[in-house]
Amino acid sequence: MRELVNFDSGERLRLSVEDKALVSVSQKGGKTKQSKKEFASIDEAKKACVKKEWESLKKGFILQDSEAKTGEASLHVYIGGGYTGALSFASIKDEIYVYKSGGQKDGGKPSDILVKLDRSGAIKEQIALPKPLAWDAQCANENLLLDLDHEIYIFEPKEAKFREILAEQNVKKSSEIASFICSANNAAVFGMFGQIFIFCEGLILKIGEYKCSTKNHVPILCAALSADASMLALCTKENELQILNAKNGEILSELRAEFGVLDKICFLDENTLLLRQYLENKLFCLDIKSAKMTKQPWIKDEYLRASEFCAEAGKLVVIDQSRAYAINLKSGNVMAEFTLDHVVKCCEAKFIDGKLAVRTDYGCFSLYKI
């Protein structure tokens, strides 16, 4: 059942379009109210329904749909504070932490927060961040790693505390400002100020260093961990990638191909990387053993521009602004093609318990059935 729920007031709201009318059914305190508003056409009624749903989300209602089909949202929560480029979130057990840009408080101090949700979408807590701008958030071993304006912090939910890794590891700030975090299999590898660390079983170990080339004054840096966290793919130069042993930083191979500048990579399996070209947003596959590069084979759209993508357990989702494609990597078939709600230009996406989780630039956090 698709309904809007307000956990604070206890109100439940169901919206539907019947013929050319918007029908609202509200339940609160054992009482039911129904209203019906006629429109000139079905399309106008549908637009009014979408508008009413969005207005309700902004008032604190949460959309839940227990009967969502493939490509449909099972959850919408209005977070607000969307900042293009910093739409980070991550999940730990039954909790989801979503970054919210809070602008400025009185006195000019930043008020950026982590919004903690449970799986029903209820907001359980709002946690003040020690620094603004959470560019990325990843989970490892029940901890949250945060890239806060290019400095890495670890948030420990059980202790409700932030660990400042810069101070812990005595990392000296340098001109190497580009940073990264990637996680898999309860481990994480992160880099800041030219130094690479692994975080595993609560311990932090330095495993290497990096130096970024630049393209149009922008540092080249992206990284990915293999599913078993044994390999780190690292790109710091145009047309060049390194595969490192993620445990000790040993260079396993150096790959050179005409892929240009990359801004996102991920492992599809232990032998294949998915690459996104900087600015062009085109996707390519790279064979790690042969360094052979091929165009993505799944989506038959020469105009495809991948604003976002994510892969997990044999599934890949590619997003072009608000258009999403879910792909079965084993068969190579597109399982579903659907439109994401509440996206203006971009979003961040990850898999959470088999569902597609999306944080949009319009201020929403959603789960979609895949």
Regions found by a protein language model. Give the residues of each.
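Short loop/turn segments that connect beta-strands within beta-propeller blades
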Residues: 118-120, 156-160, 200-203, 245-249, ...
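Beta-strand-rich domains and repeat architectures in extracellular enzymes and scaffolds
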Residues: 78-112
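Short, solvent-exposed loop/turn segments at conserved positions within beta-propeller repeat blades
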Residues: 104-111, 190-191, 236-237, 278-279, ...
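Short aromatic-glycine-(Arg/Gly/Cys) micro-motifs in beta-strand/loop hairpins
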Residues: 9-35
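A short beta-strand motif characteristic of beta-propeller blades
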Residues: 73-82, 122-128, 161-173, 205-215, ...
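Hydrophobic beta-strand positions that form the internal "hydrophobic ladder"
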Residues: 96, 144, 187-188, 232, ...
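Repeated scaffold domains used in trafficking and secretory/extracellular systems
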Residues: 83-90, 130-141, 170-185, 215-224, ...
